[in-house]
Amino acid sequence: MMIEVNHAGDRPGIAATAGLHPSAVVIGNVEIGGEVYIGPNAVIRADEPSADGSVGAIIIEREANIQDGVIIHALGGTGVRIGRGTSIAHGAVVHGPSEIGENCFIGFNSVIFKASLGDGVIVLHQALIEDAAIPNGLVVPSMTAVRDKEDMMRFAPVSPELAKFALKVRQTNVFLAEVSSLIRSTGKSNRSGE
């Protein structure tokens, strides 16, 4: 894995129980919580300066997961917060300023830019959320562009089936974080120590 300091001297803070794939890239003012999984080829960059040279933080809270090929970045002086237990699926882009609540699911190849998502929001695949605030517990359908409140009028609450799916994804990735963390710290490939 590539872990780098940014131009401002900010070094990533990574919890000992986080699991990072060897091909992940983490740069600058990034905080990664415990039991977080960072998948192959994920890029998390907090390196774009504001006019005064400061760099906003990217914060990934406990039990979140950043899957294969995800990019997380922010405009100069802004940040990104990924809430506890949130899944950012393969190929998604989260660009700050953005905040994603707890226990959310962001689907494959979706883009979140200058947006705020409440807790329990599920964004299905290839959606675009830009300059919008999504309230708690709604589903954004696949291939949907969301740019204002009118776009949200057609969104349904999260169904029990989708909530169960999001929980399963979270649980699977917490397991992957545990295994990756174990391999990183001991060189062993399973929890029994073999």
PLM ranges: what are they?
Residues 65:
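Glycine/small-residue-rich phosphate/adenosyl-binding loop
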Residues 2-13, 41, 45-47, 51-57, ...:
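Glycine-rich hexapeptide-repeat left-handed beta-helix
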Residues 1-41:
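N-terminal segments that cap or nucleate solenoid repeat domains
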